[in-house]
Regions:
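Extracellular jelly-roll beta-sandwich "head" domains, especially the C-terminal globular C1q domain
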Residues: 1-44, 48-135
């Protein structure tokens, strides 16, 4: 299991991934992470993982903000978090959870990122990414 967060707010333009500078907990070796990056590699083959993500998001302009968990560069639509911002500076708490089964073939790792999948720049406060191998 790994739990990541960041010690300061992040401003993410459309398409940018959150980076994490704080590892709250890391047990075992089923996930790899380089501090300061935004990617967690799921290294166990034919495994099942629970992925939880969230934080407080606000748009730098009035409109809809979107934060999404990506797997290997593709959005996981079931792990998409939307927030309607009525005024600049408003923040909303968002969170999602999903599951992933990794490939059983070859020496393949799955890459998990948390990305601004919207059309407006967002401010992300207290982000958290928790990944736990369950089988």
């Amino acid at each position: 299991m790994i739990i990541l967060t960041n010690s300061s707010s992040l401003t993410l333009g459309p398409g940018q991934s959150a980076t994490f500078d704080t590892v709250r907990l890391h047990t075992g070796c089923a996930e790899c992470f380089r501090q300061g990056s935004g990617t967690v590699m799921l290294t166990a083959r034919n495994a099942i993982y629970d992925i939880s993500a969230g934080g407080n998001i606000g748009a730098t302009a009035v409109g809809n903000a979107n934060l999404t968990v990506f797997l290997n560069g593709s959005p996981m639509t079931e792990a998409s978090m939307n927030s309607a911002t009525a005024a600049v500076g408003d923040t909303n708490s968002v969170s999602r959870e999903t599951g992933v089964r990794t490939c059983c073939c070859g020496n393949v790792s799955e890459a998990v990122t948390l990305r601004n999948n919207g059309e407006t720049t967002i401010v992300l406060e207290n982000p958290v990414l928790k990944i736990r191998r369950v089988a």
